[in-house]
Swiss-Prot record:
Inhibits RpoS proteolysis by regulating RssB activity, thereby increasing the stability of the sigma stress factor RpoS during oxidative stress. Its effect on RpoS stability is due to its interaction with RssB, which probably blocks the interaction of RssB with RpoS, and the consequent delivery of the RssB-RpoS complex to the ClpXP protein degradation pathway. The gene is iraD. One of its GO terms (molecular function) is anti-sigma factor antagonist activity. Interacts with RssB. This is Anti-adapter protein IraD. Belongs to the GpW/Gp25 family. IraD subfamily.
Length: 127
């Protein structure tokens, strides 16, 4: 009887599962914002005209934007257990969003900042 052996390479468990989860969530969130085919509502990912002129200081509009963005992100990213969306800076052509979140299976908070500048989104390093 001939035996065949199948060699399998399993990923190493180095204790970095939490780190890879955090990196994966940040990467996927950035893709939600920067993809031209994003499932997020267009106003949430490229609604910069709303912030131009007199609307940039409209607290009611800012609050609405944060609530809508929070709802959309929680719907599209099931690994987020809790999420708070804050606007750090609102200028005519720049918007800085801070996403403070807790992930399932992760005991440490994660902050992820996104910056709208020169017509596209940029990310800052997560904390």
């Amino acid at each position: 009887m001939m035996r065949q052996s199948v060699q399998t390479v399993l990923p190493e468990s180095t204790g970095n599962n939490t780190l890879s989860l955090r990196d994966s969530v940040c990467r996927d969130l950035f893709q939600l914002f920067s993809s031209p085919h994003s499932p997020l509502p267009i106003l949430l990912v490229s609604g910069m005209p709303e912030w131009q002129g007199h609307n940039q200081s409209d607290k009611l509009l800012q609050s609405w934007y944060c609530r809508q963005l929070r709802s959309a992100l929680l719907f599209h990213e099931p690994r987020i257990a809790a999420l708070q969306v804050n606007l750090k800076a609102v200028y005519c052509h720049e918007l800085v969003i801070s996403l403070d979140m807790m992930l399932y299976h992760d005991d440490e908070p994660l902050t992820f900042d996104l910056v709208w500048q020169k017509g596209s989104w940029h990310r800052t390093m997560p904390q």
